């Protein structure tokens, strides 16, 4: 197994946006799997920690996030999924986050988003990018196999519940979530799917999601869930919000989105949420990093409900 020195060299290489070799990715994913298999569906996290939303392959904006929030391991991070697809640098982005996880396992928590799936990545860019950068699909397979092991949710100091998407009509308690078998491809429906796909909504109760997966849930649902589970807040990602963060549902829910100028065209700010040693909350907003020369690519990304 590679030493910390090897990992440090790989992280240094990735910070320059240079992909690892296929063999290094395979070894890295093996190491990461051994760590993630020991983690929980509701992974406990201590404060202080900085909570981040979608990244979507926007590598230089991830570097900007670290510049604004502090580098690992000096800052503890919790990422709420969607590392790949849409941006130009999914390979480098997910490689860096996984390498940081392996190097600093207790300082970094990486959750699963709806894009950490075999099916979605074949449509929205990660699969094609792996083919283009490596000449075969092996790296795509190593990462998508690893994605099955990512925790679904995290719980900061038993108070702030973090996940990619939202709530599920099948899950009333955190113990319900703890009892799920997560080590599988994201299903098309059911509680695991809902956690990664659902969205808060202005209407009360449960609704049909326009995304075709998951549900919409109202303020009444979020307030009841928080009350039942002794929570102060649900922190989630999954939706573009123009200021980078957005409170909703009487401050029972906050959306954090960390990909500025999403898809290189949406004009939004990004944000991260710092949770301090006394659970105080501070949002840091940031604009896109200066544009790098984009790689030669004529990929057409299908438009899709944001």
Curated annotation (Swiss-Prot):
The UniProt annotation places Mn(2+) 1 binding at: 54, 56, 82
The cofactor required is: Mn(2+)
Q: In which tissues is it expressed?
A: Expressed in root meristem, emerging lateral roots, leaf vasculature, stipules, guard cells, anthers and pollen grains.
What molecular function terms (GO) are annotated for this protein?
A: metal ion binding; protein serine/threonine phosphatase activity
Which Pfam family name is an example for this entry?
Metallophos
What GO CC terms are in its UniProt record?
cytoplasm; cytosol; nucleus; peroxisome; plasma membrane
Gene3D superfamilies xref list:
3.60.21.10
Q: Which reaction does it catalyse?
A: O-phospho-L-seryl-[protein] + H2O = L-seryl-[protein] + phosphate; O-phospho-L-threonyl-[protein] + H2O = L-threonyl-[protein] + phosphate
Kindly provide the PTM information from the record.
Reversibly methyl esterified on Leu-306 by leucine carboxyl methyltransferase 1 (LCMT1) and pectin methylesterase 1 (PME1). Carboxyl methylation influences the affinity of the catalytic subunit for the different regulatory subunits, thereby modulating the PP2A holoenzyme's substrate specificity, enzyme activity and cellular localization. Phosphorylation of either threonine (by autophosphorylation-activated protein kinase) or tyrosine results in inactivation of the phosphatase. Auto-dephosphorylation has been suggested as a mechanism for reactivation.
Quick one: which residues bind Mn(2+) 2?
Answer: 82, 114, 164, 238
Q: Which CDD domains match?
A: MPP_PP2A_PP4_PP6 (cd07415)
GO terms under biological process: abscisic acid-activated signaling pathway; chloroplast avoidance movement; negative regulation of abscisic acid-activated signaling pathway; positive regulation of fatty acid beta-oxidation; protein dephosphorylation
Where in the sequence is Leucine methyl ester found? 306
Coiled coil feature spans: none
Instruction: Please state, per the UniProt record, what induces or represses the expression of this protein.
Output: Induced by abscisic acid (ABA).
**Assigned keywords, A-Z:** Abscisic acid signaling pathway, Cytoplasm, Hydrolase, Manganese, Metal-binding, Methylation, Nucleus, Peroxisome, Phosphoprotein, Protein phosphatase
In short, the EC number is 3.1.3.16
Task: List the subcellular locations.
Answer: Cytoplasm, Cytosol; Nucleus; Peroxisome
- Cofactor note, please? Binds 2 manganese ions per subunit.
State the top-level EC class: hydrolase
Provide the active-site residues from the annotation. Answer: 115 (proton donor)
Q: What family is it from?
A: Belongs to the PPP phosphatase family. PP-2A subfamily.
PANTHER family per the UniProt record, alphabetical:
SERINE/THREONINE-PROTEIN PHOSPHATASE PP2A-RELATED
Q: What does this protein do?
A: Dephosphorylates and activates the actin-depolymerizing factor ADF1, which, in turn, regulates actin cytoskeleton remodeling and is involved in the blue light photoreceptor PHOT2-mediated chloroplast avoidance movements. Associates with the serine/threonine-protein phosphatase PP2A regulatory subunits A and B' to positively regulates beta-oxidation of fatty acids and protoauxins in peroxisomes by dephosphorylating peroxisomal beta-oxidation-related proteins. Acts as a negative regulator of abscisic acid (ABA) signaling. May regulate ABA-dependent gene expression.
Subunit record text: PP2A consists of a common heterodimeric core enzyme, composed of a 36 kDa catalytic subunit (subunit C) and a 65 kDa constant regulatory subunit (subunit A), that associates with a variety of regulatory subunits such as subunits B (the R2/B/PR55/B55, R3/B''/PR72/PR130/PR59 and R5/B'/B56 families). Interacts with B'THETA. Interacts with HDA14. Interacts with SRK2E/OST1. Interacts with TAP46.
Q: What is this protein called?
A: Serine/threonine-protein phosphatase PP2A-2 catalytic subunit
